[in-house]
Amino acid sequence: MQQLVRDRGIPEAVSFEELVKHVERYRGTKILFKQDPRLNGERVCGAWTGDPTTRIDTVHVPADAKTEVQLFIAGHELGHMLAETPGSETRLGDDPRVQEFLASVLNPGRVVPYAFQGIDDLSNEREARAEAIGDLLVLRILRGRRRHANRDFKFEQVFAG
């Protein structure tokens, strides 16, 4: 996992904003973050959805989760984005649980072309890999915060209007 993160050009210490820019460059997309109250109390704690037409990826997190938890959820979803070859996303319909989850929780009025989400536990190899990569990413963010303690950035700002 360490090698993959290095291969993607992620510095040892990075701000959250810089990390997102690295992942956007790798994927060729814009990444947005959404606090979604419909995820509050759900079995799935986060989701990555994307639209290949608009080239926008969205990371959904529970609105009631603590900021630190949201950071780890975002790291996990960014881990999926870095682990996958751009364009190889799971299509809706590949797994009926994905379709059901997106229809019932995230966006009932709109079809989302693809999604990764954590319906399975971390015994699923893809989920475990994203979690390990996400942990490495969060560690690099925390190192970046330590090195740049004078910066006035708060993670929760990624969800501001």
Predicted features by range, described:
Residues 66, 70, 74, 122-129:
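Short, well-structured alpha-helical patches and their helix-loop capping segments
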Residues 75-78, 134:
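Short amphipathic C-terminal alpha-helix that caps PH/PH-like domains
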